[in-house]
Structure formats: C-alpha cells, structure tokens
Amino acid sequence: MLILISPAKTLDYQSPLTTTRYTLPELLDNAQQLIHEARKLTPPQISSLMRISDKLAGINAARFHDWQPDFTPENARQAILAFKGDVYTGLQAETFSEDDFDFAQQHLRMLSGLYGVLRPLDLMQPYRLEMGIRLENARGKDLYQFWGDIITNKLNEALAAQGDNVVINLASDEYFKSVKPKKLNAEIIKPVFLDEKNGKFKIISFYAKKARGLMSRFIIENRLTKPEQLTGFNSEGYFFDEASSSNGELVFKRYEQR
C-alpha cells in the first residue's frame, strides 16, 4: 500500500530533529533543471507567478539562488520533518518512532513541484514551487508537462518494491494531477472527509487537510497493508460511512461539536 500526500507551503528548519537518518531524493537531476528555470525569475515575476507578497517573493528568490545540488544535514532536512501545514499537523511525524519512520519510508510518498516524489527521510532544501504553477520549462508550459510520466514511473517502482498494487490518494487534486492513473499499476482508493456544518456534511478544507494527515498516521502507526483496514479509522471523531462510499472512494464523516 502506497500513501500519497501533498507537500506544504509552511516549512520548519528550526525544530529539533527526531531522527538523524536520511536518504537523498531520487529525482535531483530533474529538480536541478527546474532550479535553473526558477533562477531566471525576478522577485516581482515570482510574486506574480505564485500570487504571493513581495516579501515572500524575495525569500523564495533567495531560496532558488541558494539551492545546491549537494544535500547534507547542514543545508537540508528530512522532508517529513520540514513540511508544516495542516496535513502535517495531523501526521505529527515529529512523534514517530524509528520503526514508524521505517514503515513510512516504504509506504508514504510526498508529491512535490520541485522534487517530483519525496520519501519521508529524503533530505530537502527549502523551496516553494507548487505543482499548479505555470513555470515554463524545456519540456512544456507548466510543471505537469515537465514531470510527464516521471512521477508515475517512480510510484510504480515503489509499488513493485513492496509487491503491492494499492495507492491511497490523500493528496490534493492539484498534486494528484501530476500522476497518470491509467499508467499507474495500482487500484486507487481515495478517502474523503466530510464535516457536519449546520446539519449538512461537506468538505471543509482545513479539517479535510488535517484528516488526510490523521489517516496517514493511522496507517503508519497500525502498519496497515490492506485497504479494507482503513474503514477502522476513527481519529478525532471521524467514522466510516459505508452507505456513502463506493469502490474507489471511502467516505468518513464527523458530527459538528455541539
């Protein structure tokens, strides 16, 4: 079983590390090509392209400039500990045991605009390059054209290595669009998280993102390997709703706190 999650815009390079082990990203040659393109952008161009403030654009221009092809624990940190968004609040990788990291390294992948696919312990230098950004490059007009089949092929390698054919899609639509489902040697299961608001169940972005992290943690902590085991997920009040679910979609609901 291979879990897919999105990266985060918020990064943490200050907190103490809970493991000293690390691996290197497997698609660094591709990342270096994107850095080459990104370095051509001025801060105002970055601000316009990414729809971010001038201050953030300056920070990210500096990140592109400072990026080096040689990754060390001094200039990078493990991806699963560097990302700090809603998904990662639910995941709480900073509390993982070494055995948890081992299982995650085999069964969890983070999709990335710059790095393509990251394993949890892959070192990552700070960056911001969302998958949906229209960064022109030698392979096309955006990052989807740049990555082509590369991400899908890398995921197929991971599935083959564990002798499995199930992908748990906990990534956002923006990131999962970088995967070619028809070329993926796997059944795709998508958990959906609905929260009650004013008597109706719907996707509330903040809660849904955190729930994707909670589900990832549930799979890792319990060493789950079969999709039917996911129906036991009950973190923070969620419950499985079989009637609303279908073959490829598992629906989890949570009642409004009253």
Swiss-Prot record:
<protein>
    <recommendedName>
        <fullName>UPF0246 protein YaaA</fullName>
    </recommendedName>
</protein>
<dbReference type="GO" id="GO:0005829">
    <property type="term" value="C:cytosol"/>
</dbReference>
<dbReference type="InterPro" id="IPR005583">
    <property type="entry name" value="YaaA"/>
</dbReference>
<dbReference type="GO" id="GO:0033194">
    <property type="term" value="P:response to hydroperoxide"/>
</dbReference>
<comment type="similarity">
    <text>Belongs to the UPF0246 family.</text>
</comment>
<dbReference type="Pfam" id="PF03883">
    <property type="entry name" value="H2O2_YaaD"/>
</dbReference>
